[in-house]
Amino acid sequence: MICFFESSRADRAPLEVVKNSLGYGEWISVGEDFVFPHNRYRRAFEIVYRDSFDVLVVLGDRYETLAAVSAAVMRRKKVVHLHGGEISRGSFDDSFRNSITHMAGVHCVATERAFDRVMCLAGPLNVHLTGAPGLDAIKDLPERRPNKTIILTYHPETRGDDSDFKPMMDCLRRLVGDGYRIIWTGPNYDPDPSGVRDFLNANFTPARMSHRDYILACRQADFVIGNSSSGIIECPTIGVPSIDVGTRQDGRERGPSVIKFDGFASIKEAIQYSGPFDNPYYQPNASRSVADILRSL
């Protein structure tokens, strides 16, 4: 079995592959040097096309994941897709996700709406509503004590124009003047025509955190802001309000604690927000459900 996914949504580490992932993993890095999309695509394809495996498990919607799935399909290997059927109209990932859904043979989806979409895209066989397995790692959280900290997790818009980026930064500068500190998690490797990545790299030092450290940092933050799916999927379960900026995640289901960016008014709303933190991506024991499905293959 090969599992293909980003090692941590928080730290934006190199894309990695884990072989024999049910407890006996071997990590293979796609590599920091592969910053250009065509190199990362090629490397992902090569890893899967040349390796020995029976089942490929992939999560989400990245172009590198599409390459891995393409290689598996060409080798007539079984593909299990997690988090299909979701929508992010402002990102290239939306098209990649749907393409992966068409090529996969087994689907573990996170929400009821995603289940219905995959049923339409892929047919009624082997579609399972499991919830988001990554949420199972969010447990044993300390008491929340916001400490004038903001988590910034922003990536280049791939279909939008980053028009909300400057207003967002203006709001954050105002908060810094009021004594808040900003923790930036670092961007991904998407094309960056607006120069957002260069600006952030010039003004912030990325905080390299494990996934657990990211969860704990978010737990004590006043809010999370940016355009990462983690603000929509993980933050409600962490119990922290989040602000969704721009168009990258447009169409993605969200709970009431996810606030759409609308200038400083949305900042004030997030700071004052105290609940509820309902999460449409949560199902009990999602990881166990996925593991049971994998064992049955």
What are these regions (language model features)?
Residues V57-L59, L66-S70, H81-L82, H107, ...:
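A donor-sugar binding/catalytic signature common to diverse glycosyltransferases
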Residues V48-Y63:
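Short N-terminal targeting/anchoring amphipathic segment
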Residues S88-G105, C218:
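A conserved, positively charged/aromatic
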Residues R113, S257-L297:
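Leloir-type glycosyltransferase catalytic cores
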Residues V109, H128-T130, P206-R208, V258-F264:
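Short acidic-hydrophobic, aromatic-tinged amphipathic segments that line or gate anion-handling sites
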Residues E6, A13, I100-K166:
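A nucleotide-sugar donor-handling region in carbohydrate enzymes
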Residues V17-N20, D33, R144-Q220:
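Donor-nucleotide binding loops and adjacent catalytic segments primarily
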Residues M1-E32:
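N-terminal subdomain of nucleotide-sugar transferases
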